[in-house]
Amino acid sequence: MRWRRHDLHAILPRVIPVSATQIEVHVFRRRGKRLELLLIRRAPRRSLAGVWQPVTGGIERGETAIAAAVREVREETGLAPIRWWALERPAMFYDPGRDHVRIVPVFAAEVAWTDPVTLSDEHDRYAFVTLAEAAKRVLWATQRTAIVALRDEVLSGSPGGAAREVTSRLAATRAVPRTTKPRRPAARRRRA
């Protein structure tokens, strides 16, 4: 069947909009063969209070997804990762409130083993855990899928990993993090 221009216009209004307005970052550290993934817990009186999650956040107007990832990691954890990867598959979910399919670019970020975590007021605890423990703690299936992708695409060491390292792209685009959220001193935070 051959499509005519007016046929396409008749179909398009029925298509559910797709948008990328959020990012997800799986921050990890390694020492030798030991590897730990950072999870942060949503603070009380916040939406999803008590839920363990990777770093997540919104993409601001005019901001790229990777720049949003850098900014959110800095704002929510105080960390400045040394290496970054864009995972092959974004997370995706349907938002019934807005009748949109949301696409969430997923990144992996490596930090130094000794880097201190300073949480924003959005979270009340953090924990560095094994990949298996992280998969048990997170709420969403898409986050468990991303943990498997992190293992297979970034950490396996195989040259055929589908994740693309984007560390050099950050320097080229000057995706410099800026801190805008107030922080409480790290001494008040408890590790889980």
Give residue spans per PLM region:
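Short, charged/polar surface micro-motifs in flexible loops or helix N-caps
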Residues: 31-34, 45-47, 60, 100, ...
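NUDIX/MutT-family hydrolases
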Residues: 106-108, 116-150
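Active-site segment of metal-dependent pyrophosphate-handling enzymes
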Residues: 74, 78-114
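Conserved Nudix-box catalytic region and its N-terminal flanking loop in Nudix hydrolases
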Residues: 34-75
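Conserved N-terminal beta-strand and adjoining loop/helix that marks the start
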Residues: 2, 8-38
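Short, well-ordered beta-strand micro-motif
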Residues: 27-29, 41, 106-110, 128
